[in-house]
Amino acid sequence: LKNPSEYERLININKSPSNQIEMCLGSIQEMEEDGLEKYLDKFSKEDRIAYIHFRNVKGKIPNYVETFVDDGDINMVNVIKILKKNNYQGIIIPDHTPSLSCDAPWHAGMAYTVGYIKGLIKSE
């Protein structure tokens, strides 16, 4: 899929409640067409999200980079506000967490991301 609107087409092919999407925030943000928050709102309101990959990026394909969750183009505060507004009850998965320079680089990056997500959820 190259644009977020194509997800809508995919959902409309089969109206079964089992037809849900993996909502990768970074993948949708880096697509040519903007609209991450619009589609996040729509799909979470309609209970069409199986789970969310919570990651951030800067730029668009082919010139994008993965960033720390609090340092990209996506406003993660707005993401959590939208999910809360629509009573999203699904899974949020930290995804593509950058490593830190320490003895446990992946674990430290994951801990940072999980702490950030928990902080957003509790603050909003």
Stretches with model-predicted labels:
Residues 1-124:
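Histidine-acidic metal/acid-base catalytic patches
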